[in-house]
C-alpha cells in the first residue's frame, strides 16, 4: 500500500515529500509533513507560473527528468553544505550518503532521454555537489544550439527572480519560439492555490526539486512554525542509500588500495570558506567547464549584458527568492508539479534541443543536462511559498553583503535577482572542474602501458562514476574515455581489468545517460564476452551494460546479432543476469521489422520454453518479447505462424490459468491482446487455439473453476474492465468475421467513425523536432499566437489523406477463405462446444458491464456467435437467457452502435428461429421498440438533460446526437476484430518513429510534444501526425482538447471497440476550412446510420409482423390482457377484495410475464398506489390492503383473523417472484448515466506500459490550474477587497482551501464601520495563529462563503467541480456537452478567468453549514429525551407511567411519490419506488401485527440489482470521478434511499467516497484496486496524500492515554498512528493493535458501561491479569441508569461513551477495525432508530428477560381477547382473567413490582418499588420495562456516544447501511472457518517459499483447522487486529505474505519461533520439520508474541 509505513522509522516518508530533507517525524507529524505546513498554498507571484517554468527550462536546455536514473536523485538530494543551514554543515559524514528508501525507490516516469527504468538504477547517494541551490546551465559553456534558441524573456521575468541567461545567451538575439499564451494575465500577477488534500497532487520526483526555487513577494511569505524548521535536516539516516548499498560489492572488490576516500572526496566542498555566498536566486547546482577567469570576469560579462535586461519592470524584482529546498514539506509539493501545459512544452522543447544539439553526448552537452531535475521552479515553491522566516541569519547578511558589493561595482540593484543563479554557478565552476580534471588524469592512466596502472585507473574511474551524476561530472570527457575503456575490455587475459572496464561503462550510462550514444560502440565487444564465456563475472556485467543500452539502442544490439548471443548460455547465469538477458531480448523486439526476423528466429524455441519458468520477472520479459513480435508482425501471416510454431500457444494458455497467477494484471491484458491479434490476423492460429480447448480456458478466466459447460447460474470472477475487454475481444476474434453485405453493410459506416474526413488531403505543421502534426483547432490558435509573439514561421505541408480512399474493411475481414469459418463447417461438434461454453459467459459479461467499450465488444462477439451457430444449437444456447428483453432494452439505447447491433441480432434470430421469436419479440417489447424506431421522426433524439444512455451505452458514450460525442464512441469503428488495432499505427505513420512500439520505447515523449496550449495536456505519444482526434472533436475546442488528452496510448480509445479499420479518429487533420465540412460529415454520417436504422426497422416490421391478425392463437400472448384486467381491479375506490391480488399472484409466479408486459399494463403504478395511498376516498383502509397483500403473497392471516399464537412467515415464493420481476423491469428500463472515463489502455506492447484509465486525465489535473479572480461580494463592504490579481488554483483543491488562503491573510476579519473604508496597500501578513488553527484542527469555524454567480459553493466541493458546474461559461457549454463526453470540461474552463465572490458567513448561517471531510459542525440531531419539548413527557412517564408508543418504521416508506431526497429523474422511477415499498413491507411487516415473529420475509440480498451494482462499481472504480468528486447524484441518492439495490461492499466504497475527503476515498480505491497504481509513470500515479499523526502511548495506562489521544486528534483529518513506549514497532500493526486493545479495555467490568456477566480472559497479558471483563453473547448494550443514579457516576459513564463514539468514528475514518461485539439495538441507536425498538429487541440484549416478557405478552393478548368477547359476563370475565397464568402461576403470584428486572434500584415510575404487578396493570408494566431497558435508561449514554461520534463525522453518512451491517463496517468480517483453497488464493509465499513448499502447505493445513479463539490469536499476532476486514483474507491489505526465516547451517529451525512484521502482514516462518512442531510453535508465538513490537 502506497503509504503504509514499515518498521523502519525512516521508511514512512511519503511521495509528497520527495525533497524534504528526509525529515523524521517531528512533533507528531509523520512523513516529513510538519503540522504547520499549510495545506493550502497560494502565492501571489508577478508572473504566470507556467511561463516561469517554461523559461526556466528553456534556458536550461533541458527538461525535468523523471526516471530512476541518478541525475534525479543527485539533484533531489539535500544541500549538504549550504552556509545558511547550520544543521547541514554539522551532519556527520555517514549521513550524507543516506537517503530514505521511500524517496529513492519511487518509480518515476520514464523519459525517452533516460531510459534507465529498472530497480537497480534507483540507487543514488547524494553527491556533495548538489549543494548549491541549482542554477541554470549556461555561461561560457553555453554555446550549444540549445542555448542559442533561448530568448531572454525580459518582459516577463519569472517570479521576479528567475535567473536570466548569460551574456553569451543574450548576444544570440534569436528569440525563442515559445511564448506564453497567458503572459498577459500573468502580468496582472497570478497566485497559485493548491490543496494539500488533493489526492492527485502527489509530487513527482521532478516536482520535488522544483520546489527548490521560489519567488515570493515579501508580503506573501508564509511564515513557518518551528516544526518546519526542525524538518530542515539531511535525508533520513534510517536506511542506507540504495545506490551505495547496491554497489558496495563493487567497491569492496576493488581491494584496499583503491578504498574510496569519502572525506577527501568531499573535502573541497565541505570546507568552503565562510565567505562563500549562497545566492538566494540560485536554485540548481551546476558544474560546468571552467569559466574564463573566475568571478571577476563573470561579473564583468554580466555587467555588459545588463542593458539588455533592463527593460524588465524593476518594481517586481527585488522580491528575492529564497531557496526553500531543505524546508519544503509535503504540502508544498502539491503545487510543485504545476507547470501547466506550456511549461511542459517548454520543457519538452528544451529536452529536444539538447538532443539535437549533440546527439553524441559530447563534452559540451553532457553538462547541459546537469540539472535535469529542474522542473517548475515557480510551480513548486513560487506556487507554494514555503519560504521560511526561520532560515538562518547568515543568509540575509550574506545577501546584504553581496548586494552592497554589486552596487558598489555599479550594478543596478534590480539586476540582483537575475544575477543570483549565475554567481552560484561560478562558485561551482571553480569547484566542479575538479571532477573533469580528475577524469582527465584517470584517462591518462587508462591509456598507460602498464597494466597495474591501468587497473588502478579503471578502479578509480568506477568510483568516480558510481558516485557522480550529471552535475558533478559536468565536462566529463565521454568521447575519449569510452574508447579507452573499450580497449581495456578487450584485454582477454586480465579478467579484473575487463570486469572493471565493463562496470565503468555501466556506471557511466547510469550517471550520464546520454553517454549511451557513445557506449554503443562497445556492443560488439560486450557480445564477444557472451559468445565465449571465459569469466562469468565479466559476462554478467556485460549483460547488465547491454540491458541498459537496449533501452535506447536496441536496434544496434539486434543488428549485431545480440539477441541470440544474450540467450546463448542463458541457463549458466545467475537469476538476475537471466532477467537482464530476457529484458534485452524484449527490448530488441520492440521495433523489429519483418526484414529483421532472422535475428530472432533461432531464439524463439528457447524463449517459448522460458514461458514455463517459475521466475515472474523472466516470464514477464518473455511475454513482452512475444507481444512485441506479434504486434510488429501482425500483418505478416507467415511470420506469425513461425512465431507461434513451437508450443507458444500451449505454453501461454497454461500461463494464463496458473493459480496463483504469475502474470500481473497489465501483463495478463497484454498476453490476451496478443492472442486476439494473432487470431484476427492469422485465422489458422485461431483454429489451432480452438482445437486446444481455448474455450475452457476462457471460461475459467471469466468464471473461475466450474462444473460443466452450460450452467444455469453463471458467476463472473471480478476482473477489471480492461481485462474483460481483452477477454471478450479474444472470444470475438476466435469466431469467423461477419460478412460485409446485407444487414452488416452498415458496419462500415459505423467503423468509419461518424467523423470521417473524406477530403483527399490534410494539412500538417512541423514542430521543432521536424515531426509533422495535423492541425486542430486549439493547436492552430496557439501556434498562430506563438508565431506572432516570436516572429517565427513554421513549415506546413499538404499530404494525401490516407483515410480518403482506404478500403474500410479490416484486414481480417478481407480474407476470403477464413479458416475459422471452415472449421465451423468441418467440425461442428467443436464449434458447438465452443459456443455452448462461452455464450452464457459473454451474455453475463454484457449484462454486468457498465463501460461502453466492453459492451460493444461483447455485442460484437455475441453477433458473430449467433450468426454462425445453427438453429438447433441456438435454441439450446438461448433457452436460459432472456435475449428478447435484452434486445428490447438495447433498441431503446441512445448509443447508435448498440441499436444497430440489436437490430442485426433481431434479424438473425428471426431468420433462424422465427416460430420462437415471433412470439417472444411481441411479448418482450422488441416489436414495440422496432415500430417506434420505424415510425419515429426524430430518431433517437435524447432529452436535453444529461444523456440518458440506457442500458446499452453507459459511460463515455454520450447521447449520440449531442454533437460532441467523443472519439471514444462515435468515432469508434466496428466492434469486431482488433485486426488493425495496432496496424493503424503502421499504416499511417510516416516514419518508424510513429510506431506504437517505438512510442513506448520513448516513454516520456509527451513532455517534448509539439507545442501545445497550456490547457492542452501533454500527449503520451508522439504519433501526433495523425493524433486520435476526429472532427467530431473539432467541433468544439473542448472536444478536440479531449482528443489530445486521449492519445492512443489510452488504448483503443478512439477505437475502443474499433477494430476492423484504419483508425477513424485519425482523420484529425482537419484544416480550419474543412471544419464546417467536417461538421456536416459527422451529422451526415450519423444521419445515414439513423436512416439505415429507420429503414431496417421498417423492413423488419414489414417482413415479420405485417399480419397483425395473430388472433391470440398463441396462449402466451394472452398474459398481457390478463394482467391489464387484474390491474384494473386494483381499484382503490371500490373494494375488490383479494381476488385481483390472487390473479396477479398467479400471473407473476406461474406465467413468465415479461418486463415489457408489466410496464405496459400500468401494473407498477397501480400496485404502488394500492400499497401506499392513504386518502379519504379509499374504499378500504391502507392497513387492511397491506394485510390482504401479505395474505396473498405471503400466507399471513387475513385482517381480523389473527391467531392467538405468533404469526410466523410461511412461504415467500410469490413475493420473491414479484420482486425478481420488478428487478428485471428496473434493469430494462433504467437509463442512469455512468461517468466513466473508459479508455481501455494499452497498445501492442502492452502490459507494463499500459496507462491506467483516467490516469492521464489525473496527470492533466496535476499539471493544470484554473485561473480565478477573487472578488469581494458586492453585498458586503466589511471585509478587505482582494488586490492580488488573479490566482491560479489547483483544480482539485477544495473550496475551503481558498477560504483558508484568504482567512490566514486577514481577509476573513470583519471590520467595524469606523475602520478604514478600504485596505491600505500594506503587505498582507499571514496570521500565524490562524494558520496554525487551520492546520491542526478538523473543526474550524467557517468565516467566508464563496459564490460563483448566484450559487453558494459547498466547502467540500473541488474548485474544478464548482467552476464546471456553476460558472457562466459552463452554462453555455452545457448545451453542447455533458460529463460523459469529456471528463475535463471544455478548453474554456482552463483558459478563461473565473470570478469567485467571497463574503463573510453570517452568524445565523454558521450554525448549520454543510459539514464534510473534517470541517464540520455537529450535524443536526433528532431531539433527544432531554430536550425541553420532551420535558412534559418525562413527567408523564415518571408520574403516570405513560410512555411514548413505538413508531412504525414502515410508515416512512409507504408513500406513492419519490421521497424528497430523490431528485434524479429516470423512466424506471416508479419501479424503484415500488421495490422500495416491497422491501419495506418484507422487512417491517411484523409491525402490522401485534404478535408476529420479527423476521424478514425475503432476505435483503434478493433485492440486489446486478445491473445497477455493475454501474455503481464501474463508477466507483474510476479514479477521475473520485478525484473530482464527480459522483452522479443518482448513485448517492439511491445508495441512501434504496441501499438494498447494492451489495455491502459497493455501499462501503460509496460511503468512503462520499463521507470523507478525497484522499481517503482514493486510498480506499487503491486498497481495493491496487492495479490502478501499477502504472509505471510517477506522474500518472494517483496516490493520495494523507497526513499522518503519530502518538506514543504507554501500555500500562492505555485507556487513559487513548482518551487524551482522541481528545487531541479525534476530529483531525490526519491518519492516527500509534507507537508504544519502549517498543520499536510503528505503523499499521501497532495502530491496529491499539484499537483492538482499547476496545478490550472498554469492556472492563469496573467501568460499569455494559449489561452482561463478568468473566476473566483466557490468555491474559500484563495488566489484564486479574481484571474482570463483561461478556454478553448477544452483543454489548449500555447498562441502564435510574432516575436516582449519582450525577458523578453518570458523568463518568457519559464521558466514556463520548470517547467510544470518537474512537469508533475515527476507526471508520482511518479504515481501522475495533474489536467490540456490540448488540443490534446499539447499532439501531447509532442509526437513530431507537423509537422503533420493541420487545423483540430485548432478545438481543437479555434473552432471559425477553422470554419472560414474551410469555407475559401472550397473557396480555389473551386478556384483550376476553375483554373484546361480547358473550362474556362481568363475572365470567373476572374468572377467566384470574385463570390466565404463566407456567401455572398467576401474574400476582409472580411477585413482580414496578422496577426494571435485574435492576431493583431502577424504578419504572415514581414509587415503583411499592406497586405490585397484577393482571390489570400488566400491560403498562411490560411497556415500561421495554421502554426503560431500551430507551429511557440508556438515552443519556447514547446521546453522549452520538455527540462524540459526530465530532468526527456526521452519523447521517451511515444511512448507506442497515443496523445489522454496521458490525461488518466497524469490526470486520464475521468469524468463519478458513479453508485451504481460499488461503492459497489470498496469501503470498515469497523470499524462499512458493505455494509448493512443504512449510506453506503445512501452514494452510494448520490454519484451516483453527477454532475461533485460535484464529483471533493468530490474526492479532500477524496483523495487529484480531479480526479480518470484510471479505476476509481476500481483503487483507497488504496480503498475508509468508517468507522463509533463514538460519545458519549449524542451527535447527525447529528450535525457533516464527516472527512477524505486522505493518506489511509478513509472517517469517522457519521451515519446520513436521506439521506438529509448526502448530505448536505457531500457537506459542501467537500467545506469547502479543502486545509487544520489538525487532525480530
UniProtKB/Swiss-Prot annotation:
<feature type="modified residue" description="Phosphoserine">
    <location>
        <position position="1317"/>
    </location>
</feature>
<protein>
    <recommendedName>
        <fullName>E3 ubiquitin-protein ligase TRIP12</fullName>
        <ecNumber>2.3.2.26</ecNumber>
    </recommendedName>
</protein>
<dbReference type="Pfam" id="PF00632">
    <property type="entry name" value="HECT"/>
</dbReference>
<feature type="compositionally biased region" description="Low complexity">
    <location>
        <begin position="961"/>
        <end position="973"/>
    </location>
</feature>
<feature type="modified residue" description="Phosphoserine">
    <location>
        <position position="1329"/>
    </location>
</feature>
<feature type="modified residue" description="Phosphoserine">
    <location>
        <position position="1030"/>
    </location>
</feature>
<feature type="compositionally biased region" description="Polar residues">
    <location>
        <begin position="362"/>
        <end position="371"/>
    </location>
</feature>
<feature type="compositionally biased region" description="Basic and acidic residues">
    <location>
        <begin position="346"/>
        <end position="358"/>
    </location>
</feature>
<feature type="modified residue" description="Phosphoserine">
    <location>
        <position position="85"/>
    </location>
</feature>
<keyword id="KW-0227">DNA damage</keyword>
<dbReference type="GO" id="GO:0033696">
    <property type="term" value="P:heterochromatin boundary formation"/>
</dbReference>
<feature type="region of interest" description="Disordered">
    <location>
        <begin position="1"/>
        <end position="398"/>
    </location>
</feature>
<comment type="function">
    <text>E3 ubiquitin-protein ligase involved in ubiquitin fusion degradation (UFD) pathway and regulation of DNA repair. Part of the ubiquitin fusion degradation (UFD) pathway, a process that mediates ubiquitination of protein at their N-terminus, regardless of the presence of lysine residues in target proteins.</text>
</comment>
<feature type="modified residue" description="N6-acetyllysine">
    <location>
        <position position="1425"/>
    </location>
</feature>
<dbReference type="GO" id="GO:0000209">
    <property type="term" value="P:protein polyubiquitination"/>
</dbReference>
<keyword id="KW-0234">DNA repair</keyword>
<feature type="modified residue" description="N-acetylserine">
    <location>
        <position position="2"/>
    </location>
</feature>
<keyword id="KW-0597">Phosphoprotein</keyword>
<feature type="modified residue" description="Phosphoserine">
    <location>
        <position position="100"/>
    </location>
</feature>
<dbReference type="InterPro" id="IPR035983">
    <property type="entry name" value="Hect_E3_ubiquitin_ligase"/>
</dbReference>
<feature type="region of interest" description="Disordered">
    <location>
        <begin position="938"/>
        <end position="1044"/>
    </location>
</feature>
<comment type="pathway">
    <text>Protein modification; protein ubiquitination.</text>
</comment>
<feature type="modified residue" description="Phosphoserine">
    <location>
        <position position="1376"/>
    </location>
</feature>
<feature type="compositionally biased region" description="Polar residues">
    <location>
        <begin position="1"/>
        <end position="10"/>
    </location>
</feature>
<feature type="compositionally biased region" description="Basic and acidic residues">
    <location>
        <begin position="1017"/>
        <end position="1026"/>
    </location>
</feature>
<dbReference type="GO" id="GO:0006511">
    <property type="term" value="P:ubiquitin-dependent protein catabolic process"/>
</dbReference>
<dbReference type="GO" id="GO:0006974">
    <property type="term" value="P:DNA damage response"/>
</dbReference>
<feature type="active site" description="Glycyl thioester intermediate">
    <location>
        <position position="1959"/>
    </location>
</feature>
<keyword id="KW-0007">Acetylation</keyword>
<feature type="compositionally biased region" description="Basic residues">
    <location>
        <begin position="1001"/>
        <end position="1014"/>
    </location>
</feature>
<dbReference type="InterPro" id="IPR045322">
    <property type="entry name" value="HECTD1/TRIP12-like"/>
</dbReference>
<feature type="compositionally biased region" description="Low complexity">
    <location>
        <begin position="330"/>
        <end position="339"/>
    </location>
</feature>
<dbReference type="GO" id="GO:0045995">
    <property type="term" value="P:regulation of embryonic development"/>
</dbReference>
<feature type="region of interest" description="Disordered">
    <location>
        <begin position="1568"/>
        <end position="1587"/>
    </location>
</feature>
<dbReference type="GO" id="GO:0016607">
    <property type="term" value="C:nuclear speck"/>
</dbReference>
<dbReference type="InterPro" id="IPR004170">
    <property type="entry name" value="WWE_dom"/>
</dbReference>
<feature type="domain" description="HECT">
    <location>
        <begin position="1885"/>
        <end position="1992"/>
    </location>
</feature>
<dbReference type="GO" id="GO:0140861">
    <property type="term" value="P:DNA repair-dependent chromatin remodeling"/>
</dbReference>
<feature type="compositionally biased region" description="Polar residues">
    <location>
        <begin position="18"/>
        <end position="27"/>
    </location>
</feature>
<dbReference type="InterPro" id="IPR037197">
    <property type="entry name" value="WWE_dom_sf"/>
</dbReference>
<keyword id="KW-0833">Ubl conjugation pathway</keyword>
<dbReference type="GO" id="GO:0005654">
    <property type="term" value="C:nucleoplasm"/>
</dbReference>
